[in-house]
A protein has these predicted regions:
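Transmembrane beta-strand segments that form the barrel wall of outer-membrane beta-barrel proteins
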Residues: 1-4, 26, 30-44, 52, ...
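Hydrophobic, lipid-facing positions within transmembrane beta-strands of outer-membrane proteins
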Residues: 12-14, 50-54, 159-165, 240-244, ...
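Short sequence motifs at beta-strands and strand-loop junctions characteristic
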Residues: 6, 46-48, 153-159, 234-238, ...
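Transmembrane beta-strands of outer-membrane beta-barrel proteins
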Residues: 36-40, 66-72, 176-180, 242-244, ...
Length: 438
């Protein structure tokens, strides 16, 4: 396994599968590819973002229409980004030139320029922290010898061991599915305040007088919002939820559809009665549409679109605003690989999140090598989305947009390799991964 992500670096790992295909005498032998599938995954990246997983899938368990899934996961992501919660995240990026207080301010900034500017040292103040011997101190007097950097201003680390269990029942020849389950997780949050990190001398960099090197990271955006009382969950905590979803699915081929629709509605509830540290609920609706307008002219030309809207209500910890449970996969905060691809992952999160994508998938060449079949698809796409503080004020204005071009390689039909390049007003990103964006 290998991928490339502009935020997490180059990923590498291995997944080992085990199958029980059942016997030909089984009543469901012709309807399912296996009776039991298990896999173990190790995955890391060059920036140490880790995704490890054990997964069990049992279709038609005990010769019934029920399907059971269980997953144990451990994610450790020191690359996690935080820009705030709610409509405030829709504001353009700003920073001072060379990160110096009192210097001209850049508004409507580019992410890459802001990130590189935050690496510069600036004079520290009494409110800036410093970590010594594993303890965090503040109140250091301002002076020429105390410099800090904002290199990690928008970053934190979250470590999440998690257990997911779900059961699924199909109706009407599989077009309707009822899904229910639970999630148990412990979310361990580490901030970068006061940690010594690499920095750049704003004046003498590149000269013998340069003072570049390790200095304390100043107060982060996450800490600022916690101290201002804007967020919950600064110290992490347990999130245990029960969830239920209903699906209507007429896609002709799930990994790479030519036609059909996929509609889902889900509800997820966290409660202290099931040992969660937080009480909240989430509502999520998601629709995907696939249509081949000229099947007699093009071997494969598909108009693909999807639209989603979710609400997180109650005492929601900040790290949960970025997760909306879908029956096929979790939709993360807007930005990154699957939504608004021209923006960084979790660039926009809030109580209410709306998003959509339009794609044109055109197969322009296919060939075989050593008995393996490959099909090349050109995919122009357009993403849009935004967040709201109040779902009742959701509308059709002030959306963020990104557009781009993708190359999708279908390998023996079911495996899709994606290479997407996306552009927005704020950033440019290249992704290499597996499966379609939706």
């Amino acid at each position: 396994m290998i991928n490339s992500d502009p935020n997490e670096g180059i990923g590498y790992g291995v997944r080992v599968y085990g199958y029980n295909n059942g016997k030909k005498s089984d009543p469901f032998f012709e309807y399912t590819p296996y009776r039991l599938r298990f896999f173990a995954q190790y995955f890391n990246t060059t920036k140490n973002a880790q995704y490890h997983q054990l997964s069990l899938d049992m279709p038609y368990v005990a010769n019934t229409q029920w399907r059971l899934r269980a997953d144990a996961l451990l994610t450790i992501t020191p690359t996690t980004l935080y820009f705030g919660v709610g409509e405030s995240t829709l504001k353009p990026l700003t920073y001072h030139e060379r990160n110096q207080p009192g210097a001209p301010q850049v508004t409507n900034g580019q992410y890459g320029l802001q990130e590189s500017t935050f690496q510069y040292q600036r004079p520290g103040g009494s409110g800036d922290p410093i970590e010594l011997g594993g303890r965090l101190y503040s109140g250091v007097s301002s002076g020429p010898g105390f410099n800090v950097t904002d290199r990690m201003y928008n970053r934190y680390t979250i470590q999440t061991p998690q257990l997911n269990f779900s059961t699924e029942r199909s109706f009407f020849h599989g077009t309707v599915r009822l899904v229910a389950g639970f999630r148990l997780s412990n979310n361990i949050v580490h901030v970068n305040d006061g940690k010594f990190v690499k920095s750049v001398d704003p004046i003498f960099e590149g000269t013998p007088l340069s003072n570049s090197g390790q200095v304390p990271n100043a107060k982060t955006k996450l800490t600022e919002d916690a101290e201002a009382g804007k967020i919950l969950g600064y110290h992490g905590g347990f999130v245990n939820t029960a969830k239920i979803g209903l699906v209507y699915d007429t896609r002709d081929f799930e990994p790479d559809p030519n036609s059909g629709v996929f509609l889902e509605g889900t509800y997820e509830k966290a409660s202290k009665t099931i040992a969660s540290d937080f009480d909240f609920q989430k509502y999520f609706g998601h629709a995907k549409f696939f249509y081949s307008p000229f099947p007699k002219t093009f071997e494969k030309l598909v108009l693909a679109s999807r639209f989603g809207f979710g609400i997180s209500d109650g005492n929601v910890p900040f790290f949960e605003y970025r997760n909306l449970w879908g029956t096929e996969n979790t939709v993360s905060g807007l930005g990154g690989l699957r939504t608004l691809r021209g923006y960084k992952q979790d660039r926009f999160v809030g109580r209410a999140m709306g998003f959509g994508t339009l794609e044109l998938r055109w197969k322009f060449w296919s060939f075989s090598v050593g008995g393996e079949y490959f099909a090349l698809n050109l995919v122009p796409f357009w993403d849009f989305g935004r967040v709201w503080n109040d779902e009742h004020k959701a509308g059709l204005t002030d959306y963020k947009y990104s557009q781009g071009l993708g190359l999708r390689i279908a390998w023996n039909q079911a495996t899709i390799i994606m290479m997407d390049y996306a552009v927005s007003r704020e950033d440019k990103q290249l992704f290499v991964n597996f499966s379609h964006a939706f």
